Amino acid sequence: MIYHINMDKHSLIDLYNNEVLTDCQLHLTDSIETIVMNVHKNILYMSCPYFKSMFTNFREQKSSTVKLDVHNARITYDIVKSFYGFPLEEPNWKYQIDTHIVKDFLLLETGLENINLLPIPAEDFDNFIDVVDKIGYNEFCLKKIIDNIPDNYDLSKFPLDLLNGLLAVCFKYDLHISRETGVYIWSFKYNKLVLSYFDSSIIDIEQTFDGGFYFSSSTIIDSNHEESSDDEVNDDEDTDNEDTDDEGYCQISLFKFNISRTNDKYEASILNTGLKIIGPIAYSKHFNQVFIVTDKYNICVYDTDIKNLVNKFVFNDTIEIIAPIKDKMVVVTSIQIIILNLLDGKNLSKIDSNTNIISYNSNLGVFAYINNNTNVCIYSLESLSITTNINHSTTINHILYSPKSKYFIFCDENSIIYVYSTKDNYSLIKTIDFKKFLKFGVKDFEFMTSKIIVAIDIKGKICIWNIETEQIIQNIDCSEDYNNIYNIQKINGPDYSIHKKISKIIQEKTQSKLSISS
């Protein structure tokens, strides 16, 4: 007769607690204490590569006493007990990190990249840096430093190589996606959709410097959302809120859309500004104001600090596009492009053109527009003249400047993207056939950095591409049937502020090193 022994974890726990048939006394010593355990060699052998090697190849295989110098005796004790089925508790971040160090010593899988590290109190942050310094600045540790940097912490005391490592794991931007059913936010940090706001009537959306948004919607927002009260527009202002009689135009509401983030949990809150508009909206970082088309001939200026209308500009033709660029604004009407001085309200120049596509770059002081579908015109706001023409053979659907003004790109109806150098008189550098990457072609694209393009097709498949290396960085599939894409835009991500802070310190340290060497 053959008997099968069933040793579950409760049997092993009893075996340990009662010290039945123990054949080894394990001494665990760190800088503070020594803990002695009565254990079973066969359990250690089967549970841990370190002990397996020890009891196979070294003198300890015949010894009844084993002495180990360890990083943390208490945690090593807990890990050895876990071989018997005892739960391994992780009460704080220090315990979690020390557990990784001990497991690494014992040749166990640490699973460090999967640890949901507990929050690190501000008073413990320097201690955390000291601990990380011992185990090495791997990607996991760098990300945890970013996630736990206290407010107003002096990052300048970090060495340049550490700052560059931190910058490499910062996620400065999220991706805002407008679809038929509403708006979505894709997090590159968490590699998933983190917010879905269902409102199929959202027309336009603009981000402000504080990370919030203003958007226009033709539906009544859910009563659970916050309504305007103290912030409501003054009734004495001429808001042009009377319903328009113009055929094809209807007034819609302007809302403020705020996002609160707790790790990968994003929540939206909505505030009704009390304003009615009919057309596009545009945000001016220079003035911290939102420009809104209140009827087809008028642009009103909404100050986001005092939350009231402060100015109005009147035009003779239907307004199609507005783009504030520092102290000027490009206004595209149904028959021409007007350059407006925002300081005195005077028209600086007019261009006869019927276009619905423009892109501007405030650093270069220029904007680009499409003329007759196939011609790109580069217009200087300094000379008030066209400085460059790019002629193309097919219809151009999108144009865009890179953040640091290095590149100008456009995409034609065949989903081929053309890359031009702004530093070399708009010379063509390369072309990219995005039909190879996106089955349904390019619906919209956006620069995430000065050299990284994010392109999306109408269904929601995303391709992230490096202009300089010509390599695909990532493919993302957030496609949905019967929920087509309208457009995408980058928005401030969870690491936006810290990214800017680190970038500034790196620049200062680099300049300092250069000045010393020279």
UniProtKB/Swiss-Prot annotation:
Family matches, as InterPro entries: BTB/POZ_dom, Quinoprotein_ADH-like_sf, SKP1/BTB/POZ_sf, WD40/YVTN_repeat-like_dom_sf
Domain BTB: 22-92
Pfam families the record matches: BTB
Compositionally biased tracts (Acidic residues): 228-246
Xref: SUPFAM superfamilies: POZ domain, Quinoprotein alcohol dehydrogenase-like
Keywords: Repeat, WD repeat
Location of the region described as Disordered in the Swiss-Prot/TrEMBL record: 224-246
Extent of the WD repeats: 391-430, 437-475
Stated family: Belongs to the mimivirus BTB/WD family.
Protein name: Putative BTB/POZ domain and WD-repeat protein R731
Species this protein is from: Acanthamoeba polyphaga mimivirus (APMV)
Top-level taxonomy: Viruses, Varidnaviria, Bamfordvirae, Nucleocytoviricota, Megaviricetes
